[in-house]
Every structure is written in C-alpha cells, then in structure tokens.
A protein has these predicted regions:
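Soluble non-cytosolic domains of exported or imported proteins
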Residues: 33-41, 58, 133-140
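C-terminal partner/receptor-binding element of secreted or periplasmic proteins
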Residues: 124-155
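Terminal, regulation- and interaction-focused segments at domain boundaries
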Residues: 21-54, 155
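Extracytoplasmic/secreted envelope proteins and their assembly/folding machinery
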Residues: 40-43, 47, 64, 143, ...
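Bacterial N-terminal signal peptides
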Residues: 7-16
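Beta-strand/loop substructures that line and gate deep hydrophobic ligand-binding cavities in soluble
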Residues: 105-132
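Positively charged n-region of N-terminal signal peptides that target proteins for export
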Residues: 1-4
Length: 155
C-alpha cells in the first residue's frame, strides 16, 4: 500500500509538468513551445500567421521596453493579443465568464538560459476554469488552431 501511494504521488508530481513529442510543454494551464528564433522574430512570425488566418492582432506589448522605462531590467518579453469573434464567441456562449480570458494572448519570452519560448493559455484548462460543459468541439477547435499558430511561429 505504501509503495502504491508513493508511486501515485510521484506520478502526479511528474504529470504536473510534461513535454509533448514536439517539445512543447504544459504546466498550470500554460502551453509553452520552444522557438528556433529570437523573441522579436517569433512574435513577428506569429503576427504574420495570425493575420493570414483571419485573426485580428489587437496589440503587441513589449514588456522589456516597459521595464527599461521604469529603470528595470527584464529579459526579452513580448505579449501578442489577438482574436476573432467567430472563434471566441462560441466559447463565451458556453460560459460568458470566458470573456475575461479573451482575446487570446501569446507570450514570447527568453528564459534565463537564453532559450526562446512561445506560451499561451491551454483552452482545455480555460474550459475547466470556467466550468464549460458540452462544448468540446469549440474547445478542441481553438486548441488545434493555437497549436498550429505556435508551430508556424516557432519553426
């Protein structure tokens, strides 16, 4: 029994942070995909693929520049806000509180080792957060689209 409990604890701990076959990882509702490009180039590529797929890019926030203005240092960090009512509205129809997490955001950042990542909120995590039921198709559609956008921007 003790061995079973220890094994279960280890399994749950390890499953809390996992890497997919494509190198992406998911932890606490955040999907992170490694990029082969720098932060600016990754964000530029993401913006390009988003607009080519009919998404609206509302803004790009360069947190590194903001930190400099405040006299602080921050590794390269940019956020891209984007969306499309045709995609977001079905999720909000499932649960109106989903609107707090829309439009979608993508974080492009450099870690302490110099690696660049593109991170975004996992739609399945958001569905759970907002207690969305019976909307699996809409959640899966958004999840698939975000994964494709991330792949196109990071390769």
């Amino acid at each position: 029994m003790k061995k079973a409990l220890i094994w279960a604890a280890l399994t749950l701990g390890i499953s809390n942070f996992s890497f997919a076959a494509d190198g992406s990882s998911a932890e606490n509702g955040l999907v992170s995909v490694p990029s082969t490009h720098g932060v600016k180039e990754t964000a530029d590529k993401l913006e390009s693929v988003l607009t080519s797929k009919g998404m609206t890019v509302f803004t790009r926030i360069n947190h590194t520049e903001g930190a400099k203005k405040a006299g602080k240092e921050l590794r390269e960090t940019e956020v891209v806000l984007f969306g499309n009512p045709k995609v977001g509205t079905p999720l909000m129809q499932c649960s109106q509180t989903m609107a707090i997490d829309l439009p979608q955001k993508a974080l492009v950042w450099q870690d302490a080792n110099g690696a660049v990542w593109l991170s975004y909120n996992d739609p399945h995590y958001l569905a759970s957060r907002h207690n969305i039921k019976d909307c699996d198709a809409a959640v899966a559609k958004v999840s698939g689209a975000l994964a494709k956008f991330a792949k196109a921007a990071t390769e």
